């Protein structure tokens, strides 16, 4: 790992503590939505670990997933993966997107649609494509399904070369 990446990880250590309660896990249903768009990607890296269900879900869907019980900002990232797919902690969405662009790999990250209105994301507009689910997504927390999300989310994609920049499911 080069010094720039080490520096990024050190800068994120204090930020990472802020998302202690921001650990909602993606359901298998949500991951299934992505399958048509990741046919050529078999080794997935999800740097955020909740209860480990995501790794199991990806394996059930025929994909290999690197998702270990380690803090995403306190470690070196694996190099042998095809794509990053993650339901990131929304409280640190800007820092996550910066990190993922730094890793120079394709990614799909789940974030609120409202993030498109944030000033910081405008520098990425030309690089991003969106996959917008047909309904509000529900997440699990501590292994239990939530009551439902009160906001809309979408998948922010980079490096997938989708046929359209915005895909509505």
Each language-model region and where it sits:
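Class I S-adenosyl-L-methionine-dependent methyltransferase catalytic core
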Residues: 1-169
């Amino acid at each position: 790992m080069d010094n720039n990446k080490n520096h990024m990880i050190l800068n994120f250590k204090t930020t990472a503590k802020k998302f202690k309660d921001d650990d909602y896990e993606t359901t298998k249903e949500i991951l299934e939505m992505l399958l048509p768009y990741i046919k050529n990607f078999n080794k997935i890296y999800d740097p955020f670990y909740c209860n480990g269900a995501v790794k199991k879900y990806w394996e059930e869907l025929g994909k290999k997933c690197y998702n270990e019980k380690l803090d995403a900002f306190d470690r070196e990232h694996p190099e042998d993966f095809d794509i990053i797919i993650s339901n990131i902690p929304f409280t640190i969405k800007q820092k996550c997107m910066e990190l993922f662009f730094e890793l120079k790999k394709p990614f799909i990250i789940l974030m609120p649609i409202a993030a498109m209105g944030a000033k910081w994301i405008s520098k990425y507009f030309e690089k991003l494509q969106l996959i917008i689910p047909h309904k509000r997504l529900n997440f699990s927390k501590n292994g239990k399904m939530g009551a439902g999300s009160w906001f809309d989310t979408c998948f922010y994609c980079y490096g997938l070369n989708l046929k359209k920049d915005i895909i509505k499911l």
